[in-house]
Amino acid sequence: TERLFAKMRTLRDQGAAIFIVTHRIAELVRISDRATVMRDGVDVGVLAGDEITEKNLLGLMTGDKKFSTASEIKATPPNSISDEIVLSAKDLKVWDNGDFINFDLPKGEILGVTGLDGQGQDNFVKALAGIDQPLSGEVIVKQSDEERERTKKDYTTVNSLLDAKKSGVGYVSGDRKKEGIFPNMSIYENMVIPLYKGKQAKTSGGFIGFIKWMELNGIFDWEVERLSIKTGPKNNLITSLSGGNQQKVMIARAFTTTPKILILNDPARGIDVGAKRDLYKHLRIFVNEGGT
């Protein structure tokens, strides 16, 4: 990045004009002499010189003049964190040369894991969600009431995505193109597909399950509104949406299953700053209502 910026500055000093389109605010602050902000297809303001700050850009991008910068935002304290353990990792190992991982996740906590790309966090998260098998160890999840009644056990070992789903675990991938969206299906189908039940029938209107359409429509409309998803006609292909709105649909899909535990792998990838703030707010609401 630094080499690119240095080359751009050299070209500018030689008289070249450079036009950059980006949602990466830090890049604009570091490289731009003038910045125009667009919101919903409208030019909402132009900044120049010392006016190009993170706070000013965020204010124009979100329409909120009091918008706080990322460095000023602090996590909202949880209402309560229970002593009840809902997920545990026991001697979990996801890399040959990695350490064993042991931890307990109490109900009502938001646990963050970070690291540079390619340092094992993707393998770790997928092992927790039952997508990939760890090299050793196990992931234990408290079962849903339905599964506990059926198996007579409070906890179960997660060996697959189906095991996780039965125990009320929802997952959102950070790679929507490879692991998230169904590109040949509509926006609507992409969001509510986990709710389809029973034998499916193919018609000109798409896949129809045995859940009442009224209920599905209500769920779809609710998630669109609360996550501020700009969808257009819901029967349009998911690929008609911007990357950020595709990501929101994936997050909404996880919420439609009313999970007890949400595992999110880089959930804010490709989402604008205002939507990130809304997402984090909804995650806090989720845990305050009993989720983890």
Language-model segment annotations:
Residues T1-T292:
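Glycine-rich phosphate-binding loops of nucleotide-dependent enzymes
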